[in-house]
Amino acid sequence: MPTVALYNTNGEQVGELALKDEIFGVEVHEPVLHDAVVMHLANRRLGTHDTKTRSEVRGGGRKPWRQKGTGRARHGSIRSPLWRGGGIIFGPHPRDYSYSLPRKVRRLALKSALSAKVNSGDILVLDELKLDQPKTKEMARILNNLKVDDALLVTAEKDEAVERSARNIPNIKPVQAALLNVYDILAYDKLVMTRDAVARVEEVFA
């Protein structure tokens, strides 16, 4: 069973926390992590790209010159794909790129990402994180005490004060435990979680 150090907001170690093997101690499956990241990026795509075919380009209704007798090549429209300014053949059109991996694969990918952070020592657990009001300066102080400047900050539930305090700090992203995804975990150097967030992750993804 993996254990991690438990810190207070002053950056001092106040104990250790045992993590569940089935969440934070699984074998890291890199191909599954790759699949999960590709899925996440595909699902973020808007898919609004578009090109006009010869029937959609403005103009080109009249035959540019008669079929025979001019000595020039025969053409029926100035919007043929052969012409500059003409339509596009087989160009991109709006489409939906989103898809979903099987639930078991998604869960395995998330557990692999969390386990990878534990293995590399890039997970920090806070005993408690409470702010009376949104205060970016106070959040920056806490992160500085932890020697963190690029991290995913995970809370157990939606915490307006923490979210508003952290969202203006560069390279820091606040997120709720139930909304964790593989891409965010891997995209940031450190994973900073509250003790309650760890319990919530173990409850939701067990």
UniProtKB/Swiss-Prot annotation:
GO biological process: translation
The organism's place on the tree of life at top rank: Bacteria
Residue ranges, annotated region (Disordered): 48-77
Composition-biased stretches (Basic and acidic residues): 48-59
Function description: One of the primary rRNA binding proteins, this protein initially binds near the 5'-end of the 23S rRNA. It is important during the early stages of 50S assembly. It makes multiple contacts with different domains of the 23S rRNA in the assembled 50S subunit and ribosome.
Protein name: Large ribosomal subunit protein uL4
Cited Pfam families: Ribosomal_L4 (PF00573)
Subunit structure: Part of the 50S ribosomal subunit.
Matching HAMAP family: Ribosomal_uL4_B
PANTHER family per record: 50S RIBOSOMAL PROTEIN L4, LARGE RIBOSOMAL SUBUNIT PROTEIN UL4M
Keywords: Ribonucleoprotein, Ribosomal protein, RNA-binding, rRNA-binding
Xref: InterPro entries: Ribosomal_uL4, Ribosomal_uL4-like, Ribosomal_uL4_dom_sf
Skewed-composition ranges (Basic residues): 60-77
Gene Ontology MF terms in the entry: rRNA binding; structural constituent of ribosome
Family, similarity comment: Belongs to the universal ribosomal protein uL4 family.
One term under GO cellular component: ribosome
Gene this chain is encoded by: rplD
